Amino acid sequence: MTEVFLPSFNTGNFSKGAGIIKQTLWYFANALFVLASWNPFMGIKIFFLRLFGAKIGKGLVIKNNVNIKFPWKLTLGNHVWLGENAWIDNLDEVIIGNNVCISQGALLLTGNHDYTLSTFNYRNAPIIIEDGAWIGAKTVVCPGVKVKSHAILTVG
């Protein structure tokens, strides 16, 4: 097995999908309005997510402390629920269908590293969650997973 040498880390062909100005503006908008626990107003959160490129259907319920890394890589269907402390770490696309519940503390993780390379490159893949699925509290969804319609993922 190849020995990992972290100083040689290489992002490979990874793209954040936005320029540095957009990324910086999102960082502050997210911290002040979307991720902020003081803001109970879903309309403000939805406004900023759409402003930064998220495709959002009607009826989104987004609770406090929901962290979304790159809204421009996010598609949400109709009547999606995002519970408290959910984290969408979307280095790649995340597509969530209609009537999907992402419960408290769930982690959607589209990125990882290739430990077989000394450069520890990213190994990213999209996540697709089909209509009617439920991602239970504290559940981790890994890169490349496709959650089928009306499936239930839980910890345990």
What are the residue ranges of the model-derived segments?
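Short, charged N-terminal helix-start/capping segments
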Residues: 1-21, 62-85
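Left-handed beta-helix
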Residues: 58, 63-64, 69-70, 77-78, ...
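Extended, positively charged loop/linker patches that create polyanion-binding surfaces
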Residues: 120-122
